[in-house]
Amino acid sequence: MIRCLRLKVEGALEQIFTMAGLNIRDLLRDILRRWRDENYLGMVEGAGMFIEEIHPEGFSLYVHLDVRAVCLLEAIVQHLTNAIICSLAVEFDHATGGERVHLIDLHFEVLDNLLE
């Protein structure tokens, strides 16, 4: 079953990463690619993403997941969210020499499949 997730990223967060010499969009693509290849619990049959511009507020990351068991969707979304937050925090820490960034507001909304 295909589900669509939306992650809204504020423009201020994107600017903070840019000032640290990082491209948050590229980081999110890489994180999602690694997460998809890891295939948490073998429950994800496919995953794709695209970015929608929302000027000047930032952008939205849409992730389309083909999951085997909808009952595990909440656990899969939580695992993906944790992977994104932890990976972004580590990348920011390395790029800034130990600075921290507030990422707790990053969370996915589960939407109906936008492709159907």
Curated annotation (Swiss-Prot):
The keyword Membrane does not apply. GO terms for molecular function: identical protein binding. InterPro entries: Mastadenovirus_E4/Orf3, Mastadenovirus_E4/Orf3_sf. Keywords: Early protein. The keyword Transcription regulation does not apply. This is Probable early E4 11 kDa protein. It comes from Human adenovirus C serotype 5.
